[in-house]
């Protein structure tokens, strides 16, 4: 192993069993858990995010859970800073950071760093007004004219990323794509603090059922269980807050946006259930796309009964624990 301290990434699609395996690992390895999930950062969003129970969190603490109010935003850059700080604290105690979750953009930000992008609150507010007045399709058309690479990457119905890409261009006169390419070239060889390489030897694990149909069944079952556990009431409580609205990143989380639309009268209960399940399946598909391109990832089958021993064998084989 290199002179860098070890870290473990436990990735995978939603409903694959990541948390269960992570907890088992903490029982046999000197690991501490860091959540890598863009929905779990929000307080009061427990059922729809499949947040581990209070009992589980008390017995097996996860960092970066319940660190933001739903009215606040939380970016990949903020995650990277928080995760690096948590990893350093864990390593200083002689423990191994075990990062678990399915927000692949966060993992990428941690590994590759993020270019500092220009921002301007007034420009962003104007773009938000344009989105409301003209629609997201018009914003996507504008982005395609000035930054076709970003437009091809960003879904036309993703207001947060559309607005951010246009904001960067309007503030700096440079596309987000060009900005990233230039800053990446400038940061080659820099350390993690400057946005370069991660100062850890990382073991990348991914867990998922080998049969995609099984994952789809799990997703449908879990969404139904969330509804039985009071997911609609959870979203109803969020809607009762005057500072929350459907355009916030928290409320756009998979499942939450569908229940919000149901409570707004835009969907029937059956439509909400169906669209929530479909949106979760689409999320899983995007996660698989990320993982297929992830370098040196070791796959585990969710359906196997010996994933703990398989994981320990793999970690021993690559000498990350020595």
Curated annotation (Swiss-Prot):
Q: Name one GO biological process term.
A: tRNA modification
Pfam families, sorted: IPPT
Organism annotation: Pseudomonas putida
Transmembrane stretches in the record are: none
Cross-referenced PANTHER family, in alphabetical order? TRNA DIMETHYLALLYLTRANSFERASE
Question: What EC number(s) would the UniProt record show?
Answer: 2.5.1.75
Annotated positions for site Interaction with substrate tRNA: 103, 124
List the catalysed reactions: adenosine(37) in tRNA + dimethylallyl diphosphate = N(6)-dimethylallyladenosine(37) in tRNA + diphosphate
Gene from which the chain derives: miaA
| Name recorded for this polypeptide | tRNA dimethylallyltransferase
């Amino acid at each position: 192993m290199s002179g860098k301290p070890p870290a473990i990434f436990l990735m995978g699609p939603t409903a694959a069993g990541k948390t269960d395996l992570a907890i088992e690992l903490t029982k046999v390895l000197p690991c501490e858990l860091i959540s890598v999930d863009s929905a779990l950062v929000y307080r009061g969003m427990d059922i729809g995010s499949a947040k581990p129970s209070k009992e589980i969190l008390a017995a097996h603490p996860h960092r970066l859970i319940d660190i933001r109010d739903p009215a606040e935003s939380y970016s990949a850059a903020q995650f990277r800073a928080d995760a690096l700080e948590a990893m350093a604290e864990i390593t200083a105690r002689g423990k191994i950071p075990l990062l678990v979750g399915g927000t692949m953009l966060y993992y990428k930000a941690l590994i590759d760093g993020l270019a500092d992008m220009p921002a301007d609150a007034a420009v962003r507010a104007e773009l938000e007004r344009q989105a409301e007045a003209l629609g997201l399709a018009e914003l996507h058309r504008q982005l395609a004219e000035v930054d076709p690479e970003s437009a091809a990457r960003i879904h036309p119905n993703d207001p947060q990323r559309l607005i951010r890409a246009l904001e960067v261009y309007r503030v700096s006169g440079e596309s987000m794509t060009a900005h990233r390419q230039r800053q990446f070239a400038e940061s080659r060889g820099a350390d993690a603090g400057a946005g370069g390489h991660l100062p850890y030897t990382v073991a990348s694990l991914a867990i998922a059922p080998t049969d995609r149909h099984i994952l789809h069944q799990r997703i449908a079952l879990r969404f139904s269980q969330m509804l039985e556990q009071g997911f609609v009431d959870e979203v109803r409580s969020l809607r009762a807050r005057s500072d929350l609205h459907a355009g916030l990143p928290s409320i756009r989380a998979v499942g939450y946006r569908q229940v919000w639309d149901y409570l707004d009268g835009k969907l029937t209960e059956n439509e909400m259930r169906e669209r929530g399940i479909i949106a979760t399946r689409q999320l899983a598909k995007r996660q698989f796309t990320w993982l297929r391109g992830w370098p040196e990832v070791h796959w585990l089958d969710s359906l196997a009964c010996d994933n703990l021993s398989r994981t320990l064998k793999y970690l021993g084989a690559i000498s990350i624990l020595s």
